[in-house]
Amino acid sequence: ELGTVHAVLADLNTEAGRAALLKACPEPDVLVTNNNGPAPGTYAQWGEAEWEGAFLANMIAPALLIRSVLDGMRARKFGRIVNITSAMVKSPHPNMGLSTAARAALTPFSKGLSKEVAKDNVTINNLLPERFDTARQQQMAKIAMEMRGLTLEQARAEMAATIAAGRLGQPSEFGDACAFLCSAQAGYISGQNLQLDGGSYQGLI
């Protein structure tokens, strides 16, 4: 039976925004953390404000949300936490250093915590997507168009060519993977970093 969906407009980078979200659902069994990534650039462009903003959005805010719901999950003996990070956590790119560094910081925090709460049937995993057909990729395509004079079709084709599957991922494919990790059937999977990259990652671990 499907429940009722409640939308909450909130800035997760603020205490008030996180409080508004938790007020709408104070005792969740499932938490999926996701936040806007910082814009690409070069190390010379990133000052203190840029670094602080990246870590607030992509490491600190998720960690604080996890802290807010974890005790309840442990008490109820069920919880599923999935952090949306990035494939570049394992395959960094210099232009994405802000995003990669902040999301990478969330990874060992989640891993360590997952070992503490696994006995309470609470799992914590990370999804590492790359090149899904979302607004983020539209933003990246526009940057390529502006910098290199490409058409939208050319920019998207170049993106697809970097993926072993030869195409961008579909949001529904991402949703299916996330839904499985949030399910009761995934209770023996925790502390993992699942690559969703069309087979592009070249490493073994």
Short names for language-model regions:
Residues 34-40, 199:
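Conserved NAD(P)H cofactor-binding loop of Rossmann-fold oxidoreductase domains
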Residues 42-44, 50-55, 159-160:
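Substrate-binding pocket helix/loop in short-chain dehydrogenase/reductase
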Residues 66-67, 111:
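A short, exposed helix-loop element centered on a Lys and neighboring polar residues
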Residues 71, 115-116, 187:
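Alpha-helical segment proximal to the catalytic Tyr-Lys
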Residues 80-105, 110-119, 130-132:
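Catalytic loop of short-chain dehydrogenase/reductase
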Residues 91, 179, 190-205:
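Short C-terminal tail/terminal secondary-structure segment
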Residues 118, 123, 189-191:
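Short, small/polar-rich loop/turn modules that mediate ligand/substrate recognition or access, typified
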